[in-house]
Amino acid sequence: MNLTNLADIRALLARHDFRFSKSMGQNFLTAAWVPADIADASGADAGTGVLEVGPGIGCLTEQLAQRAGKVVSVELDERLRPVLAETLAGCENVELVFGDVLTLDLPQLVAERFGGLRPVVCANLPYNVTSPLLTAFLTAGCFDTVTVMIQREVARRLCARPGTADYGALTVFVQWHAEPELLFDVPPHCFVPAPKVTSTVVRLRVRKAPPVAVQDEKLLFTVVRAAFNQRRKTLINALSAGVPGCDKARAAAAVAACGLDARVRGETLSLAQFAALSDALGSENG
């Protein structure tokens, strides 16, 4: 069976009376080069343990199994259990887990399932839960790389630079935890059903430590969210509106302490500037 052949896919799904779920963001690949190239991009080899999320009918899973020491594939849709039992019957190094990956203890999963293998994530992510999944992967503290296919617009946000339209809170969060790299685009016609948007494969190399030091990481991201929740406001106004216990006087003092113009907007600040601002604001609030 060819898991990227449209006729084979339709026959497979018909055998199991499977219907696509829009709410789960299900789009299955029909271009053989895509899962092969994603699996290659993950760097998986015999010494690698791969966590995959949302295997669909298993076309990427199959490619990962050919390269990795072990693949743990987590699928939310129980209706795919008999489908995957058929398509992955010959993949002895694949373990299927049915459930919501966001409820799993990822460090425990890695420790129990992968042993001494190098843990990575490789997946075609459901677009409707991209941000929560990336957050879970990057904060788990147990993965070397995260190679995923996501909506192109989101991928551009991950790699954006200060002062650009794509730069936002997600950018700062991801770049704080990882070094993102855009790899290649996948057009809509490579899927069934075809999505309305182009997809992009991106690789995140997870940092061993943050790129700059900060006194209070929780406060840092409170500051970041406040800055981007009020993009059209000056940073001083955004901070006073979005950071608990911060009035305009404290916000202005922190901005001045960082050598920033009083009229500056948050969307222009770099990671280092956000960290410095957070530290200054922490000192002001202290």
Model segments located where?
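Short helix-coil junctions and helix-kink-helix linkers
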Residues: 240-245
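Short amphipathic alpha-helix in the helical subdomain of ABC transporter nucleotide-binding domains
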Residues: 248-251
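Catalytic cores of RNA-modifying enzymes
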Residues: 1-226, 256, 267, 276-286
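Short helix/strand-capping connector loops at secondary-structure junctions
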Residues: 253-262
